[in-house]
Amino acid sequence: MRRMSLIAYASFLFTLCFSGLAFGGSYLDRAALLVNEAGHEGNVLRIRLGDKEFARVVHSLSQSRLEAASHMQVPKEIALAHPHLLMVLENYERASDAAEHGEAQRFLVLLQKATEEERILRLIVEQLGWQLPKI
């Protein structure tokens, strides 16, 4: 009987300790995927800034990425970082919109804003005791 109690107690502690990791980890994986892909597309778009069709495709992907992030489930352990994820993705979306409309200067400014907001996002995630994984 005592052994069963110890096993149940150990299981409870394990669940308690790692439940945040499971929820935070899933969110962080999704956030990292969204941020990394947005950053990659932004860098590729900067090289191909004159290609309107490429910019249109990147803009469409950026809109979808922002929409997906807007409806993600956010664990309370990481909730303070989520608005910054949205700002990162919004700046990438606006940058790709500028590229699609041939506004090179606006594109570069918004790309820089997205990069700066990503830095802030990563700092906040670290302050909360987490880290965006490398995906």
Predicted segments with their positions:
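Short, solvent-exposed, charged loop/turn and helix-capping segments
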Residues: 63-86, 129-135
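Sec-dependent N-terminal signal peptides of Gram-positive bacterial secreted proteins and lipoproteins
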Residues: 12-16
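C-terminal amphipathic alpha-helix
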Residues: 24-58, 94-135
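Bacterial N-terminal signal peptides that target proteins for export
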Residues: 1-10
